[in-house]
């Protein structure tokens, strides 16, 4: 195991340690790439157990140093430090970011502006995904789905309205995790909030912080508070994260819950989720999903190395690992370019139609707002 991960240096530490104290000279290509991951542990595992070892097999001269921030708990602090490093012309201690803040960084002009000359494999990525990234580079995708126990739920709800009615008709059999703890619960909360907004307002919140529109979340908070006595526990308490939601499903303690497509597929493959747990998409509106973005910091010290890593990730070899490995993710290049075995079951995939989550600033306010407006109310 040590040999397998010889090139991986995992730094799970206070966020402040992720930033250098002074400016440093640019590193030569083929040295250290500082990767900051703001996500759940399955993304951490994807990088450290699959992507980095495989990348190092063909690029042995790179040492990838990982800093992990679970579920973006320190996104606001990290963003502030990046801005400060730019303003003071100091080394941010980060070259590449995988996390929800990437589009915010891009909109603020803090990301390296890439092109297909620097990253040739971008030519295979749909232009709409690149444009939506605001300077971020899409490298994988996933979708929040509604998981249900097919033994107990013969006709699962297919719309948000039907789901809300089902929850009230089946007390204690539905749950979702706290939005700050994971994206599946966050997606459910955003979807309820969006159900009370116009299409134009939803589109705005996906790209721009808007306090006026946020004020209209009040109707959504009211709906969510009204579910407290009907969700698992029936006292306004919720699972702490994505994994806790999956655990309740696997043990049969709940029959219905929102889950990440990649996480539920991984659990079924690993045998930790019963095969009678199925998934379905809902509409009116749908749960959120779409690509995850990588951002190359404009003032990072190893932009060339970050470009090499991203170009490899966008190759068929890199995308096959995302689709067929433990991640069970969705590709951002045409399925026709993937290994046929890896692509089995996703031939009709169109990730360009997935509904995106809010931009980071709005998403953070969803998380904090839910914590004060919903639990125990």
Map each language-model feature to its residues.
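Extracytoplasmic ligand-binding site segments that recognize negatively charged/polar headgroups
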Residues: 38, 42-48, 69, 73, ...
């Amino acid at each position: 195991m040590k040999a397998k991960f010889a090139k991986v240096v995992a730094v799970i530490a206070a966020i402040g340690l992720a930033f250098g104290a002074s400016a440093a000279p640019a590193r030569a290509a083929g040295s250290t790439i500082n990767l900051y991951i703001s996500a759940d542990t399955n993304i951490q595992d994807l990088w450290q157990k699959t992507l980095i070892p495989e990348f190092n097999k063909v690029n042995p001269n790179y040492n990838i140093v990982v800093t992990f921030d679970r579920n973006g708990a320190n996104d606001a602090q990290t963003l502030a430090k990046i801005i400060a490093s730019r303003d003071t012309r100091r080394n941010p201690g980060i070259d590449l970011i995988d996390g929800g803040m990437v589009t915010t960084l891009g909109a603020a002009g803090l990301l390296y502006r890439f092109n297909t000359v620097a990253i040739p494999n971008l030519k295979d990525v749909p232009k709409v995904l690149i444009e939506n990234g605001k300077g971020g580079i899409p490298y994988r995708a996933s979708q929040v789905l509604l998981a249900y126990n097919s033994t107990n739920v013969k006709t699962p709800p297919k719309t948000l309205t039907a789901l809300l009615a089902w929850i009230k008709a089946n007390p204690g059999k539905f749950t979702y995790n706290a939005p700050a703890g994971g994206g599946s619960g966050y997606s459910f909360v955003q979807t309820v909030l969006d159900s009370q907004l116009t299409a134009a307002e939803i589109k705005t919140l996906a790209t721009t912080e808007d306090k006026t529109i946020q004020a209209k979340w009040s109707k959504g908070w009211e709906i969510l508070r009204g579910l407290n006595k009907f969700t698992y526990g029936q006292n306004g308490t919720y699972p702490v994260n994505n994994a806790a939601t999956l655990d309740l499903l696997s043990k049969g303690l709940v029959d219905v819950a929102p889950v990440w497509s990649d996480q539920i597929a991984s659990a079924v493959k690993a045998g930790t989720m019963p095969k009678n747990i199925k998934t379905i998409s809902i509409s009116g509106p749908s749960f959120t999903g779409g690509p995850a973005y990588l951002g190359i910091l404009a003032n990072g010290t190893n932009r060339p190395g970050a470009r090499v890593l991203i170009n490899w990730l966008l190759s068929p070899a890199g995308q096959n690992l995302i689709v067929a490995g433990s991640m069970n993710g969705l590709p951002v290049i045409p399925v026709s370019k993937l290994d046929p075995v890896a692509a089995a079951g996703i031939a009709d995939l169109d990730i360009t139609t997935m509904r995106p989550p809010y931009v980071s600033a709005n998403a953070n306010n969803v998380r904090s707002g839910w914590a004060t407006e919903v639990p125990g109310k």
